[in-house]
């Protein structure tokens, strides 16, 4: 979430999010941890959704590139030196332990920082901290759409109208440019035109 120190909606925060993302070998995690049952993401949507695209501008940040990750992290440090640890919280009564630990190891080894998993005993404890905005670290998240449409992913998870406990935007991400794209998509006269706006919104998220 953007309320964490060093991860605001600014140049430093963008650089650090990109660096962390490019530190993770999603392909290996999908193969070794999920035994081939998961697919590395190239989009914020599932493949059957009409707005899904493998060609989004900026989606290179979703690809494993440790040398670029180190470069971006160094640029962020030039703005504000990193200190402390990077943690990813998860509920220990679920199935996230192995993949969260794997991701933390990638981040630790690539960026040479203290990165660790943070288990919370139960789903209730975990969700209570997420819903109340009390998380003091990054945390695992998941989403199952109610219906197969881009808005049920993007509006629910990233639009300002779904922040502050009003929807699935638990990280309280707020970006007027993104919101404007969602408004245009929702009022578009055709699916094809709506999908173009959804994709432009996703490209904002990838920045």
Q: Model regions: which residues?
A:
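Structural transition elements
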Residues: 5, 39-76, 93-98
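Extracytoplasmic/peripheral linker and loop segments enriched in polar/acidic and small residues
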Residues: 14-18, 22, 30-31, 114-125, ...
